[in-house]
Amino acid sequence: MSKTSKAYRAAAAKVDRTNLYTPLQAAKLAKETSSTKQDATVEVAIRLGVDPRKADQMVRGTVNLPHGTGKTARVAVFAVGEKADAAVAAGADVVGSDDLIERIQGGWLEFDAAIATPDQMAKVGRIARVLGPRGLMPNPKTGTVTADVAKAVADIKGGKINFRVDKQANLHFVIGKASFDEKLLAENYGAAIDEVLRLKPSSSKGRYLKKITVSTTTGPGIPVDPSITRNFAGE
């Protein structure tokens, strides 16, 4: 939705920019300010008090959202033999090795997450410049370089999300769809924020969660109180 459109302005007028909403209030308001007919994605944007230029202040992690994202992720797996068979059985959308790498080198990128067995990483490294900038490069820290590919596929299909701070110290991740009940969105929010808090670098000084907004892909940002992570029972 264009930020100059009449519908967007009407939605933005519902948000009090001087107020910090609770997670539950923000989830409810995000639903109300999504004016698209499609089931919009609900997203969280966080400004962190870290310096991403410093290796010890990189914030990167994963979390299994208790209620999923509302979207079935398309998963690519780099594996051979029994591991490849296990990935297929677990529901991976595409499985391969050199053939899959060649396909990606040719421009095919129709997947949302990639998993690799450790023995495949030397080969996968050939497409690191393609996968890395898109957040698709398998990494042991996110559980996507693993011998247990079946579990990794199941986790991602079940609502596991990855997040990584960008160069501007921002984090972005999805917590569900506008069709979700606001309580479910708030619970997903709480699970994700708790993990972000757990990963706070010891070298990060001062305020860690500087600013948080919740919004749909078509709606205005709703400011959330950074001091509250779990507020499900009421407002």
From Swiss-Prot:
- CDD domains reported in the protein's UniProt record: Ribosomal_L1
Query: Which Pfam families does the entry mention?
Result: Ribosomal_L1 (PF00687)
- InterPro entries the UniProt entry points to: Ribosom_uL1_bac-type, Ribosomal_uL1, Ribosomal_uL1-like, Ribosomal_uL1/biogenesis, Ribosomal_uL1_3-a/b-sand, Ribosomal_uL1_CS
> Does Repressor appear among the keywords?
yes
GO CC entries? cytosol; large ribosomal subunit; peptidoglycan-based cell wall; plasma membrane
Keyword annotations for this protein, in alphabetical order, are: Repressor, Ribonucleoprotein, Ribosomal protein, RNA-binding, rRNA-binding, Translation regulation, tRNA-binding
GO BP terms in the entry:
regulation of translation; translation
Q: Which domain of life is it from?
A: Bacteria
Any one Gene Ontology molecular-function term assigned to this protein's record = rRNA binding
Role description: Binds directly to 23S rRNA. The L1 stalk is quite mobile in the ribosome, and is involved in E site tRNA release. Protein L1 is also a translational repressor protein, it controls the translation of the L11 operon by binding to its mRNA.
Per UniProt, subunit arrangement is: Part of the 50S ribosomal subunit.
**Membership in a protein family:** Belongs to the universal ribosomal protein uL1 family.
Name the PANTHER family on file: 54S RIBOSOMAL PROTEIN L1, MITOCHONDRIAL, LARGE RIBOSOMAL SUBUNIT PROTEIN UL1M
Name under which the protein is recorded: Large ribosomal subunit protein uL1
Which lineage is the organism of this entry classified under, starting from the top rank? Bacteria, Bacillati, Actinomycetota, Actinomycetes, Mycobacteriales
